């Protein structure tokens, strides 16, 4: 019978807690290892299999590191503000605070049932005033240093619900709640100046131990482009506008220019006879998301304004159009169109019968997007590539109509949310003093409990007069609080800093302590956060460094992503599909460690895969078998029937597998290849089980090997391993033990099995000494009885030896 069950889980969890086994030693930072999993959002009532796939394997890696001598800091908390709790409140009437704290209580129990090595005394919960006080402090620091500002910007607006929607709430251009078409509405909102750090965010990526795909995604998101900014004057007007282009060499081929529908110039440039069509087009553009507008497969549309611009290089008049594929917040919100050398411009010009003029030689047909000698470009004809660009920019700069420019796709971070369940923005508005930041001594600006959640067209906080009406900290007169709350990504942009000093009531963290504890050594979470959370956290770290609070450049030195656990049907798990897996049910039946080990063995950690109930059952059988093996080993160790001290063939074979397993598991653990680690453990289990059937055993080797295999399985099955360790060693705890080291000498075999082929087909396998010469190997192969029988009466033409693997005998 197996000695493992949920009772074993409970027994050892209680013991670990009583003895503070995993307490981080803040006075011993020489071998500090900060291991961090992205904290979870308590929107659902319980953790699902995906959470476990993030947390359990990383906990195994942390345990392994503890056993190799590291002082592991592995905190846990909850990203507790956000939209789902507020939507749940609108739907059910249950207050977000009540539902969130209840869910956190449930999830804490689940996480503890995992037996993870979390430092719970460092827990942070972002919706508590003692946390968001410092989120508000962060806002004020950025504001004081010119990195937070307020401006008008378009937001998703549902006319039916009378509320702003996050991008995630817009599905196919409609409100996910009521199905009404979403429009864009200009609102005055708060931004963080992440663009100030665009170049550093880009350059520092190459120094990080991060997945290449994630680094590539951030590089694309930042989107650095080197080119030129060209000024176009409007014909018969004092108006002018700039365009950014990476192909200034094609400037003579511009046959029209395009403005974004949101551009303020659109109204000024539109002639009266075109006004109605332009307004209608702008209204349609408001209903499209930026992703839809920039789609390469979507047919391009536009409308003529009736105005013309002057091409600054040849003084030709070109029509000014409005088109929704131009985004106002990217670049200058205007583009020059060269249909002969750009596919999008070519399609647009063809559709609207606009001129197409070739200015670059090359290609059999248009559009030709490569480089070549210029044609139809006046004084620049014959110039090519960079020389053409330099000559044209030089000419433009003489008249202040062009200049070199570096452009970034990255835009400033919009942090305002017209929602309730978030950290209040700590500013007030005074008629006399204007925008006034709340003094730090008055933080936190607490979120009121009694508010009206149902959408009214205004931020929910405006329904609380007690909250909104306040006194100006500057003049003492009447003031009104900001009614927007902060994006939840602001809360998660700095939580890794608070973990290290979570009980500090005087500051968000102690600078000296942080300088020793940070940066995070290993960070693990989903790849979907590449261009938001991971980018925002990098920005906040750099901003706080420059303000003087941090002495490091990057928050996360090493990053790993986990894959996705799918339902048994291979589809993404969801309640509506009925394919979700409850960790609680599996733990109740098989125990926490069976669940952990199945997650690590059944899937490549970076890839994930489809769930299998049979896989869980197979892992349960393996744990039972391992348990029986340890019981047998204990009996043999305590009551040896026959014992020897020398190292015979069986001992050398076991010792080889033992040391090979230690080496392989150690190396694969650091690669996060948990599935191969457990495969090695299974091979090791087979080898030790086989040795237990030998009559005359080396008891010292048996005990040492049994101790090592328990140590190796400990990170993967911590409760189970403690129980097995207690059986063999009868002392506490296996996690206070040193990780086993392999012996290089034991990895050199005295004998090796080789295959013998005759004309390419395997006829026999023999064991030979590893130090035999090639001639000796040939002789051993030809002396085998099966080989003799197969070659009898035949002419041996050639004998080919591949050392350590095979002998191929060619006969006729």
From Swiss-Prot:
Domain of life: Bacteria
Keywords from the named record: Aminoacyl-tRNA synthetase, ATP-binding, Cytoplasm, Ligase, Nucleotide-binding, Protein biosynthesis
Motif 'KMSKS' region, residue range(s) on this chain: 572-576
Subcellular location: Cytoplasm
Chain ranges for the short sequence motif 'HIGH' region as given in the UniProt record: 40-51
Sites where the protein binds ATP: 575
UniProt name for this protein: Leucine--tRNA ligase
Predominant localisation class: cytoplasm
